[in-house]
């Protein structure tokens, strides 16, 4: 009987997600044993600067992927939005379970909604994507960077000068806190989610046929199709945490994958937004990226990256 070693970050949310996946896999095949290996990533260690300044995407997965490649673990559970567009050679996303709530959630003092927050109010987020879209709607607000796990950020809202913070609804839901703390859910037409937000990525070695066979029973086709379009868009735009980029796909009544892509300037003053639909998720993602690039989105991404490079020198 095989014991499957599962890599996970140490945070409460990461461990909750990993244990949920293990329980589901045990239901599918009770003959496997699972053992969790906690791994500390660079993103967990560096908490005093914004993600965009320390390398963006991959910060929460690189050490875990190294453990996979060195066969120290057999599989890993990640938040899909943390996954870079391109994986290391030899690794695959073996499974994408059914997506949780993809929306962003506003948690505020006094349970105020976004339009009720006072002029000049301070919003805490560590995401350029969120801050750009919030500033586009409410340019009078002040963005203040906030880092740390979900529980740390909720504590900072209470003890520091934030009027509100924005978190992924999925994380709050998985922790069982969504109903208690959320002041307002920000719908995708108002704040477009990050690529893959709300979905989990179960990563393993491409050569592990036994695990891939087990995972095949756990993959959600709807989530797989929509996330594939979003990730193709991210890859084509060459975006990461350094740039305000968003992508969210759904399946329309013609059974087509319909993707909305967005690229913004960090101040929210310039926003490019396009929609593409079709049956091939990869093609849709690339087409949406091409449409936006023609209008100037790619040039905006390059200029934002250049500014960040100069700031870091």
UniProtKB/Swiss-Prot annotation:
One of its GO terms (cellular component) is cytoplasm. Binds 1 dipyrromethane group covalently. Pathway: Porphyrin-containing compound metabolism; protoporphyrin-IX biosynthesis; coproporphyrinogen-III from 5-aminolevulinate: step 2/4. It comes from the Bacteria. It catalyses: 4 porphobilinogen + H2O = hydroxymethylbilane + 4 NH4(+). One of its GO terms (biological process) is protoporphyrinogen IX biosynthetic process. InterPro entries: HemC, Porphobilin_deaminase_cofac_BS, Porphobilin_deaminase_N, Porphobilinogen_deaminase_C, Porphobilinogen_deaminase_C_sf. The porphobilinogen subunits are added to the dipyrromethane group. Belongs to the HMBS family. Monomer. HAMAP family: Porphobil_deam (MF_00260). This is Porphobilinogen deaminase. It comes from Bacillus velezensis (strain DSM 23117 / BGSC 10A6 / LMG 26770 / FZB42) (Bacillus amyloliquefaciens subsp. plantarum).
């Amino acid at each position: 009987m095989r014991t499957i070693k599962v890599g996970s970050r140490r945070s409460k949310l990461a461990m909750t997600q990993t244990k949920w996946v293990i329980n589901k896999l045990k239901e599918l095949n009770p003959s496997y044993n699972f053992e969790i290996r906690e791994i500390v990533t660079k993103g967990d260690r560096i908490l005093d600067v914004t993600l965009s300044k320390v390398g963006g995407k991959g910060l929460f997965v690189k050490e875990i992927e190294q453990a996979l490649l060195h066969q120290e673990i057999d599989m890993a559970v990640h938040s899909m939005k943390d996954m870079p567009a391109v994986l290391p050679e030899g690794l695959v996303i073996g499974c994408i379970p059914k997506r949780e709530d993809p929306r962003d959630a506003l948690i505020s003092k006094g349970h105020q909604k976004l339009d009720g927050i006072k002029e000049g109010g301070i919003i805490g987020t560590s995401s350029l994507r969120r801050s750009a879209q919030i500033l586009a709607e409410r340019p009078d607000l002040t963005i203040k960077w906030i880092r740390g796990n979900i529980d740390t950020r909720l504590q900072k809202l209470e003890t520091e000068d934030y009027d509100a913070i924005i978190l992924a609804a999925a994380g709050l839901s998985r922790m069982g806190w969504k109903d208690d703390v959320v002041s307002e859910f920000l719908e995708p037409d108002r704040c477009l989610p990050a690529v893959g937000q709300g979905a989990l990525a179960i990563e393993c070695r491409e050569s592990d046929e036994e695990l891939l066979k087990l995972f095949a029973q756990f993959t959600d086709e709807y989530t797989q199709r929509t996330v594939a379009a979003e990730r193709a868009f991210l890859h084509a735009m060459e975006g990461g945490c350094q740039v305000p980029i968003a992508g969210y796909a759904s399946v329309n009544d013609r059974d087509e994958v319909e993707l909305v892509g967005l690229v913004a300037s960090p101040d929210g003053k310039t926003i490019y937004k396009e929609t593409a639909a079709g049956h091939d998720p990869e093609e849709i993602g690339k087409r949406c990226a091409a449409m936006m690039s023609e209008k100037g989105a790619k040039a905006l991404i390059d200029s934002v990256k250049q500014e960040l490079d100069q700031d870091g020198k």
